[in-house]
Amino acid sequence: MQQFEWIHAAWLAVAIVLEIIANVFLKFSDGFRRKVYGILSLAAVLGAFSALSQAVKGIDLSVAYALWGGFGIAATIAAGWVLFGQRLNNKGWAGLILLVAGMVLIKLA
């Protein structure tokens, strides 16, 4: 395991935020019919992967990727609820709980 440094955690946080922004812009793009939002989404994805590449310099890839994906999904669910009124059904909540449990297990491994 690599030695933890806060700068790598900060890069991971930036990657997560950019992934959420990319997903929101993708929704606003309406299937790339609204080109500006589509381009902004692509730029945010590029930024997210760039930030993730910096994060994995100090965080194991398996941990960084699991946290990036898991937090990105959970926060995108929250953004969908707040911005678009989207709701999870019981199966969706179960999936989210399993996702969070998986992230915890990977971090503890």
UniProtKB/Swiss-Prot annotation:
| One Gene Ontology cellular component | plasma membrane
Please give one Gene Ontology molecular function term for this protein: amino-acid betaine transmembrane transporter activity
Tell me the membrane topology, using the record's own terms: Multi-pass membrane protein
Q: What Pfam families does the record point to?
A: Multi_Drug_Res
Q: Which cellular compartments is it found in?
A: Cell inner membrane
Q: Which residues cross the membrane?
A: 6-26, 36-56, 64-84, 88-108
- Describe the task this protein carries out: Catalyzes the excretion of spermidine.
Protein name in UniProt? Spermidine export protein MdtI
Query: What organism does the record attribute this protein to?
Result: Klebsiella pneumoniae (strain 342)
Lineage, please? Bacteria, Pseudomonadati, Pseudomonadota, Gammaproteobacteria, Enterobacterales
